[in-house]
Amino acid sequence: MELRTDAVLASLEMSEPVKNDEDYESLPAHASLGTHMTAGAVAGILEHTVMYPVDSVKTRMQSLQPDPKAQYRSVYGALKRIVRTEGLLRPLRGLNITVLGAGPAHALYFACYERIKRSLSDVIQNGGNSHIANGVAGSVATVLHDAVMNPAEVVKQRMQMYNSPYRSLYDCVLMVSRKEGLAAFYRSYSTQLTMNIPFQAVHFITYEFMQEHFNPHRQYRPETHIISGAAAGAVSAAVTTPLDVCKTLLNTQENVALSSAHVSGHLSGMVNALRTVYRLGGVPAFFKGIQARVIYQMPSTAIAWSVYEFFKYFLTQHESHVQEVSHKTSPT
């Protein structure tokens, strides 16, 4: 998920006078941080909540040695079987920890991205759009995002798996910390970064590229944010699926798969994960769940961008209105 802030001025296409102040993309300096964090938190929570059942399916489809009862051919077929055999709420298992992590993680993510992108764009292209600035800003923002989100990812994916032994969120956190130590919550952090840094770099560059073509004046146009976000999510999800498979293995520590690969103890490290995945399924194993991953990411990033841009626009316009009223009522 992600975003954009260029200093290109665009007045609203309404029957009101053209204003000379910055449009919503440029965000007034006094309000930008709070606006970005609020909009980012809301966008992140909605993104993960709306598409969570598909994310649960993706986690199961990436299992290297799935239970015969948990082998699925399609996302729809998987959801139908899970609901029929495990209950209506089963696809939502682990959603609570995801929401707890997504709010602060995305608040930091969007705020960091906007600040770094603006600073780098000023240096590289005098405030104009720069793909280098977009990629670097997205990568740096990812480091902060994943530091907050990684423990939530570990708990979430363990609760999503078929026949998960954990009764609740608290039970999962307690059992993992007792048996594997607190380090277990960050065992996949380096792999997460290895996956998410290229993911976000591709994601932001694709989004900005699409915006340049569909929304060159950087106005608030919801349809362009949805289209650009969906395209960015699909491309970045597809090219990073092999790394996501490795991350899932490190997060879940899938016992059957590790036993088949003769791995004793706990699997750690990207190199070991790559070797294990290849040993168990060859090259095709690196693309397990790619359909579910793309289906999940396309609407997720479209939701994240459209919600983020809406709240950024709404909050900025509200603050501008408050300032205008305050200025008019203040004594001269």
From Swiss-Prot:
Gene null: resulting phenotype: Morpholino knockdown results in embryos which are profoundly anemic.
GO cellular component terms given for this protein: mitochondrial inner membrane; mitochondrial membrane; mitochondrion
Domain of life: Eukaryota
Single biological process term from Gene Ontology: erythrocyte maturation
Main location: mitochondrion
Solcar repeats: 31-119, 129-213, 220-314
TM spans (from-to): 33-52, 94-113, 131-150, 188-207, 222-241, 289-308
Localization annotation: Mitochondrion inner membrane
Known tissue expression: Highly expressed in hematopoietic organs, Expressed in the intermediate cell mass (ICM), a tissue equivalent to the mammalian extraembryonic yolk-sac blood islands. Colocalizes with gata1.
Effect caused by changing R158W: In frs-tg180; induces embryonic hypochronic anemia
Catalytic activity: Fe(2+)(in) = Fe(2+)(out)
GO molecular function per UniProt: ferrous iron transmembrane transporter activity; iron ion transmembrane transporter activity
UniProt keyword terms in alphabetical order: Ion transport, Iron, Iron transport, Membrane, Mitochondrion, Mitochondrion inner membrane, Repeat, Transmembrane, Transmembrane helix, Transport
Leader sequence residues: none
Bilayer disposition of the protein: Multi-pass membrane protein
Protein function: Mitochondrial iron transporter that specifically mediates iron uptake in developing erythroid cells, thereby playing an essential role in heme biosynthesis.
Family designation: Belongs to the mitochondrial carrier (TC 2.A.29) family.
Stated name of the protein: Mitoferrin-1
